[in-house]
Amino acid sequence: MHTNYDVLGMADLAAGMLDLTETEVLEEVLDGEGIGRTGRLPKIMTLEECGQFVKERFSLPNVKIFGELNKMVATAAISPGSGKSMARPAFEAGVDVLISGDIDHHTGIDMADCGMAVIDAGHYGIEHIYIEDMKKFLEKELPALKICTAPVRQPFQVI
């Protein structure tokens, strides 16, 4: 299930966090809008460097990478939240790496075997940026209200 914000905001926000250029919709839903974005990374880098870049941009302690760490990547697809359903559209778009969350073992291995790397930042790893974005929007639209946010917490523990 996707929300209106998934179609009209989340992917653009995430693509902006990665400084993607020449962006396009990954999977069109309606009238040129849709889920995910593709684009050019700010520079060509190794997959390992891209993983570090994603960690830094989204303030993450770790990411899971499928693919050869020394592979050079220049283009990316980003699909915040669960990205398993975006594997085929990303592959068909011909990008070097899919950046998403909730990529299962077999999908990640299959994509890497097909030549497309995957960076799994976790379901909430990318989507947590929604909170601050929505807070700013509400503060602008409703200046008389004090907008408070809850701290971001993963719904599980990694030990």
Show where each model-derived region lies.
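Hydrophobic structural segments
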Residues: 1-159
